[in-house]
């Protein structure tokens, strides 16, 4: 059983010769199951369209005949084996000719079972034993009776199973061959008074069961739907009579199946997961992530489907095996990660690139796993305390590693690259939001004294600083952030000092500061921006000063430098100075 395919087993049940196999053939859109009184089904025959496989009609019929013949000699329950057939499609569930607009989600693997009539077969008791053992296979039961059949013993038995195992049940009355619908009054007539009375009697019996078992308000069992397989086979496939309404009962019946599936996706997903846990040999983190994907896809915003019914919803819960798998997986992975974290921290300044990368990847995988598991938090028995304990424990150990590497100064270490810092801060923001300011400032502080300003580095630095500025939460952190930005800008001035166009650059920066920042400076406050302004002004002054030893005590303007720059302007021999980097950084600290 594959995780991603939610298996839904629909069993067609009823007494002998009520038209079960004929009904199956109508759903399949092809006569695969033998019909007629002499063609009674003796062994469960299952059909699935999953994979849209090619099939051979005669081969399927032959296999069914062989299985039925062999079943006649069965003398013990354990020898009853079902026959599985793969076909291309279920016509009635997939075609739109009946005006049914809703479609069954492709993630569902539908299996339709043509079941033996357990009431009068010579192996009746064995089949009843088989059913009591295998009833949990079924997700939806279609109970078929006929308009002249008063024997509801099997119905009574199936109702008890429906309640015990939370199975959906759709009830139909077949052989309503003279049924008519008055479209003006929406009143159904079954053709004769006797048939009308029997139909009322059957549904009254259904109402009594609903009252007796308190199942009236939760849609586990439908009222009996009148259908005529005979009419559908004739009218439904006869293009000359396509406007006739004799097959309208089938439209209601098929809509009931489709709605039972589409309206209870989470219910079927939970049953599927419980089955998979029970039979799967491989149980891993990947399996759990797949389970969470299934639940998320099945519209798990509400706790359970049927949440307004007032029924005991705990029956829909995931199995104890599932919760044990969750607990064991989280505990095991978290413990291994903590051990790795301790080793990395103990390495201190000798932290290894591979060991750090290894543990960092493990932690990201673990936290992604925890996020996926949270889709189950509204289910009973979700181990919230355990999940939170190990999530915080892993994050705390990760922060211990970050403390170590944040003490370094950036000198092209891989783990202090801007791209990696982005990942660290995103992770902290998501899982430990209160620590974001602290570690954002720590990490960017490591880049305050960089030795080079290539364009790609400047672009990355702007992006990370903007990300930090957008997410800082308090004024104190913003002031510290401004200090770091000012350090970077002053360091850039130092980097440019020996460049040919330094004087032009530093004057451009001074003018930029004056236009962008100075209007926002308050008189009664001295902060990092004041230091930046005064340092820039001083650097302009130094750039045009005479630095010879004779001018040590009294700095004069270096006329050579000034005239040289003016001469360049005169000759047009100047450089285009870009201060976009500086402008973008200054825009980030205007909030001061």
Curated annotation (Swiss-Prot):
<dbReference type="Pfam" id="PF00350">
    <property type="entry name" value="Dynamin_N"/>
</dbReference>
<protein>
    <recommendedName>
        <fullName>Uncharacterized protein R618</fullName>
    </recommendedName>
</protein>
<dbReference type="InterPro" id="IPR045063">
    <property type="entry name" value="Dynamin_N"/>
</dbReference>
<dbReference type="InterPro" id="IPR027417">
    <property type="entry name" value="P-loop_NTPase"/>
</dbReference>
<dbReference type="GO" id="GO:0005525">
    <property type="term" value="F:GTP binding"/>
</dbReference>
<dbReference type="InterPro" id="IPR005225">
    <property type="entry name" value="Small_GTP-bd"/>
</dbReference>
